Each structure stands twice: as C-alpha cells, then as structure tokens.
UniProtKB/Swiss-Prot annotation:
Gene3D superfamilies: Porin (2.40.160.10)
Membrane-spanning parts: none
Swiss-Prot/TrEMBL domain comment: Consists mainly of membrane-spanning sided beta-sheets.
Gene assigned in the entry: VDAC4
Purpose: Forms a channel through the mitochondrial outer membrane that allows diffusion of small hydrophilic molecules. The channel adopts an open conformation at low or zero membrane potential and a closed conformation at potentials above 30-40 mV. The open state has a weak anion selectivity whereas the closed state is cation-selective. Involved in plant growth and development at the vegetative and reproductive stages. Is important for leaf and pollen development and mitochondrial membrane potential steady state. May be involved in disease resistance.
Organism encoding this protein: Arabidopsis thaliana (Mouse-ear cress)
Assigned protein family: Belongs to the eukaryotic mitochondrial porin (TC 1.B.8.1) family.
Expressed in which tissues: Widely expressed.
Name under which the protein is recorded: Mitochondrial outer membrane protein porin 4
C-alpha cells in the first residue's frame, strides 16, 4: 500500500544506496533476456581477483506467484517461490538451496495502512527466527527488529530505528549492534538530477566515530556520476553510462590516501538487456 510504512530493513535505504550502490571493484557481466511468455533469463559472471564466479537464473512471474531458480558455478541450486495475496495484504516466500538441506526458510510479510510486519524462520530443527515491525506512515515510521536463535535460546540481534521521508529529504536514526552503535543518515534531493547524502556512525564501546559523505548527479539523461568520501581517507567515484535502453556500463574507482603503497581499486560492470 502506498501510504504504509516501509519495512524496517528499508529505513535508511536511500542513504545506503547513494553511498554504496554501484561501487563494484571487480569485473562483472550481466545478460538479461526476456522470452515471449514473460520468463526472464539472467546470466551473471563475476571475476574477483584470480577467481571467477557465475550463475544462471530463471524468473517466472504469474498472477500471484513468482518462481526464481538459480544455478551457480559451485553446482548449487537455489529456489525461491513467492506467493502474493496468500491472505489479504500478505505474501509468503519459501526459499531453499540444494544440496544444503538446512537452508530452507519461510518469510511472511503483512502490510497494513499504518504498520508493516516481517517474519522469517528457518525450516530446520533449530531455526533462527527473525521478526521486524514498523508503525507510522510513508513519511514517518518507527520500528525495530529482533533475531532469536532457538539452538542457544538467545537473542542474536536487536535494533531499533526511526525514519523520515518528505519533500526530497530522507533521514534515519538507527540504534544497532545490540545498542552498541548509533547510525544517522541523511539524503537531500536538491533537484531531479542531484542528490547529496551523509552517514555518521557512533560506536559506544570504543567511542569511535566514522562518517561518509557522497553525491549523485545526472550529467545528462544517459550518464550518472557518483562520488563519496570518508573520514578513513578513502575517496570513490562511479560513472555509469546507459548506452542503450536498459543496458549500461559502470566504471568504479576508489583511492585510499592512507595506503600510499597500494594501487587504487578499479572496477568495471557491464549489464546488457536486449
């Protein structure tokens, strides 16, 4: 629903995407093809250092069902089945990986005009249970998440946060790492082509502060340039060019001023969708 609050995992997502999305310092190739029946086929290859990884996936979308099947270069088969409108305002996702018989998981999401609930449980004898909830609206929401390990009967994660989105401004304040750190994010969309963002993290255990600032600017309708700088001395840049509809090439670079003997990190990603 358009007026419903975002899931807890999406609080602060705009800043995360601005500061991290498309910064790939490897070599990646993606080919997406769509059949006449609407089935999508995607082949992905990734070269990381001297290693190569790849996978082939098939995505089928029905009226109330989505089936995603993926086979990777390690001979693993991953399957995800999404059932929409299982109940009013609810959907369920069943996922598992072969040959890992303990990888099965069931996710359920319920969306209300003033609340969003997410739950996840492993389909094994000692599952990990994840619960998250947000209340409010599309503009202002408050929420939290917990993870419970049934094997050790202990809480492995608990976080809380608040998010704000309105008129080109997105801000979030999240208490995470079991209360050990506080993360604040801010994104300002100056105009349809330019955005600025920042992230500040305060770690209470060692009184350490870290921050990152970044920007995104559309040079023209086909080219986007992103930059980011952190207090650790790292500076990064992304240039993405759409050279045909839904196909783009991305160049990434990062320089660490504190590692003067190391070469800058460089990355290249090519995505094709005929």
């Amino acid at each position: 629903m358009g007026s419903s609050p975002a899931p807890f995992a999406d609080i602060g997502k705009k800043a995360k995407d601005l500061l991290n999305k498309d910064y790939i310092f490897d070599h990646k190739f993606t080919l997406t093809m769509l059949s006449a029946t609407g089935t999508e086929f995607v082949a992905t290859g990734l070269k990381k250092d001297d290693f190569f990884f790849g996978d082939i996936s098939t995505l089928y979308k029905g009226q109330n069902t989505i089936v995603d099947l993926k086979i990777d270069s390690h001979s693993s088969v991953s399957t995800k089945v999404t059932l929409k409108n299982l109940l009013p305002s609810a959907k369920a996702v069943i996922s598992f990986k072969i040959p890992d018989h303990k990888s099965g998981k069931l996710d359920v999401q319920y969306v209300h005009p003033h609340a969003t609930l997410n739950s996840s449980i492993g389909l094994n004898p000692t599952p990990l249970l994840d619960l998250s909830a947000t209340i409010g609206s599309q503009n202002v929401c408050l929420g939290g998440e917990v993870s419970f390990d049934t094997a050790s009967s202990s809480l492995t994660k608990y976080n809380a946060g608040i998010g704000f989105n309105n008129q080109g401004v997105s801000a979030a304040l999240i208490l995470e790492d079991k209360g050990e750190s506080l993360r604040a994010t801010y994104v300002h969309t100056v105009n349809p082509t330019t955005s600025f963002g920042a992230e500040l993290i305060r770690r209470f255990s060692n009184y350490n502060n870290s921050f990152t600032v970044g920007s995104s600017h559309s040079v023209d309708q086909f080219t986007v340039v992103k930059t980011r700088f952190s207090n650790s001395g790292k500076a990064g840049m992304v240039v993405q060019r759409e050279w045909r509809p839904k196909s783009h090439i991305t160049f990434s670079a990062e320089y660490d001023s504190k590692a003067v003997t190391s070469s800058p990190k460089l990355g290249l990603a090519l995505a094709l969708k005929p």
